[in-house]
Design a protein with these regions (language model features):
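Core catalytic alpha/beta fold that binds nucleotide/phospho-ligands
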Residues: 1-105, 109-197
């Protein structure tokens, strides 16, 4: 598993990012039986989805230096891991995990694609005048991250607003509660990654 980065964001929070190159069979060989049973029980239809989930478990086991770890999920899909606040995301051959021992966190990763321009009306508000593919990718991912962060609010895209964008972050507001958050981002030719700490 080619780990691209382990970034210690602050003393309590770590961001893990890696490129998934393994086959499903290779990943099965890295996971304990109880983890494989959990994955089989979830009955993922897509092979690529199973690979992403297996890669996430392989990374967590390696990073946490444990022989077993199980990620549980709330009914809304939010992941739970004993001893940590955790957020997980995957896209076309990449996966990321954000772990914190103290604070709620959220993360999203999306592959770089021009398709975002076709769906802009799905996630952009009329008062968000952004046009470039890069801006649209960052905003799409940032709204996915904000949605995860405020998961209890069950936000719709039009209930999240971008107030400003800088070189490495966005200022965003949850319009249901008027709570503001800074969403950090990283943009490459392969993906955009956004997170809240």
């Amino acid at each position: 598993m080619p780990l691209l980065s382990v970034e210690k964001i602050n003393p309590h929070t770590t961001l893990l990012l890696w490129k998934i190159t393994e086959t499903e069979e290779q990943l099965k060989g890295q996971l304990p039986e109880n983890v494989l049973k959990t994955i089989v029980h979830k009955n993922y239809k897509s092979s690529s989805r199973r690979i992403e989930v297996m890669a996430t478990y392989a990374l967590l086991l390696s990073y946490l230096k444990k022989t077993s770890v199980i990620v549980h999920h709330k009914s809304n899909g939010q992941p739970l891991l004993d001893g940590f606040h955790i957020s997980i995301s995957h896209t076309n051959g990449y996966a990321c995990v954000l772990l914190s021992t103290q604070n709620v966190v959220a993360i999203d990763i999306e592959y770089h694609s021009d398709r975002i321009a076709r769906i802009r009306s799905k996630f952009l508000r009329n008062d968000e005048p952004f046009n470039s593919i890069d801006q649209l990718l960052v905003i799409w991912s940032a709204k996915e991250t904000l949605y995860k962060y405020f998961s209890a609010d069950d936000l719709m895209f039009d209930e999240m607003k971008v107030e400003s964008i800088s070189k490495s972050s966005l200022s965003m507001i949850n319009l249901k509660t008027n709570e503001k958050r800074k969403v950090f981002y990283s943009l490459t030719s392969d993906y955009v990654l956004t997170y809240i700490i």
